[in-house]
Design a protein with these regions (language model features):
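Conserved, non-catalytic sequence blocks in retroelement Pol enzymes and Pol-derived host proteins
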Residues: 86-92, 164-169, 217-220, 295-298
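Extracellular regions of mammalian proteins, primarily the fibronectin type-III
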Residues: 94-98, 108-120, 132, 152-158, ...
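C-terminal subregion of chymotrypsin/trypsin-like serine protease catalytic domains
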Residues: 2-24, 114-119, 123, 226-232, ...
Length: 323
């Protein structure tokens, strides 16, 4: 009798696993690996879940527990071309980690290369986008000139958007894009450093880099621009014209007067140099603001070192360059 019961149970599990499910278009409906995996569990895991409830879940693979390692490479090194700042063009490929996201053939947002497999950007930049239509371009300088430098283009194999990103407040505005094919490092394509966990950049001068508009309502820049901005404390930002409750500890504010990021800079880097004039760390990601350079409204950035564990957790299949 027990043997018959076991056979019936086994046949039931096989039947459940073979039951057809409604096909889903993951490209259209899902914008993060987390959601993709969750949907797979919901649509294809019913029989597996039933089996695990009876016989126990399998153990986690050992490699899933291993921490993110270090690559044999350096990060944050700029190129030594002549530098012009204050909303003026940069030297060609001075910041070799700066990437632009192109969607359906058009410029969409900025991003930053953090190793040869991943770029980091703002979560709002990839909201409701079809992954198959996103391209990441690195080593570029002038959008209007084809092959003006040693640029490379990559498709995106996966998107990991922070699960708690709030479209109303822009809290947790961070996302990782995995490149379909790794890039090789060169003079024009190199990663930026992530900041140390305890770094407080307030009071420092930051550098914003991107192809954003040079003035509110203006046209997008054709070549990479950079501007230096003072980074404010949390209290200074909450004392600006923004409602104090809008500024969370996960955000940074930077800018003064006309020195500010602008539309089109979203997702791009806010950089500081803490180890010398030519080595940079990514302390912020351009997130939101009111207008461009309006008095009392500094630019608001995602505070990157609040998300170091999140970044490393979602990059366990790769490594980071030595800081």
């Amino acid at each position: 009798m027990p043997r018959i019961s076991f056979v019936l149970m086994f046949l039931f599990v096989v039947y459940v696993n073979m039951t057809p499910m409604k096909e889903q278009n993951y490209d259209e409906d899902i914008d993060s690996d987390e959601d993709f995996n969750s949907t797979q569990r919901q649509t294809h895991g019913t029989g597996r879940i039933f089996f695990e409830e009876i016989f126990g879940a399998p153990s986690v693979d050992a490699e899933e527990k291993e921490p993110l390692g270090n690559c044999t490479c350096e990060c944050g090194l700029v190129n030594q071309e002549i530098r012009i700042v204050g909303g003026m063009p940069t030297g060609v490929n001075r910041y070799p980690w700066v990437a632009r996201l192109v969607y359906d053939g058009k410029f969409h947002c900025g991003a930053s290369l953090i190793n040869n497999d991943y770029v980091v950007t703002a979560a709002h930049c990839v909201r409701r986008l079809k992954r198959s239509k996103i391209r990441v371009i690195l080593g570029d300088h002038d959008q209007t000139v084809i092959n003006d430098s040693d640029s490379v283009m990559r498709a995106v194999s996966s998107i990991v958007r922070h699960r708690h990103f709030d479209v109303n407040s822009y809290n947790h505005d961070i996302a990782l894009l995995k490149l379909r094919k790794p890039v090789s490092f060169s003079k024009t394509v190199r990663p930026v450093c992530l900041p140390p966990d305890g770094l407080d950049p307030s009071g420092m001068t930051g550098t914003v880099v991107g192809w954003g508009r040079t003035s509110e309502g203006g046209t997008l820049a054709s070549v990479v621009q950079e501007v230096q901005v003072p980074i404010l404390t949390l209290n200074q930002c909450r004392g600006s014209k923004y409602k104090p409750s809008r500024i969370t500890p996960n955000m940074l504010c930077a800018g003064k007067g006309t020195q500010d990021s602008c539309q089109g800079d979203s997702g791009g880097p806010l950089l500081v140099s803490t180890q010398g004039n030519d080595k940079y760390e990514l302390v912020g990601i351009v997130s939101w603001g009111v207008g461009c350079g309006r008095p009392g409204y500094p630019g608001v950035y995602t505070r990157v070192n609040r998300y170091l564990d999140w970044v490393k957790r979602n990059m366990r299949d790769t490594c980071l360059c030595v800081n």
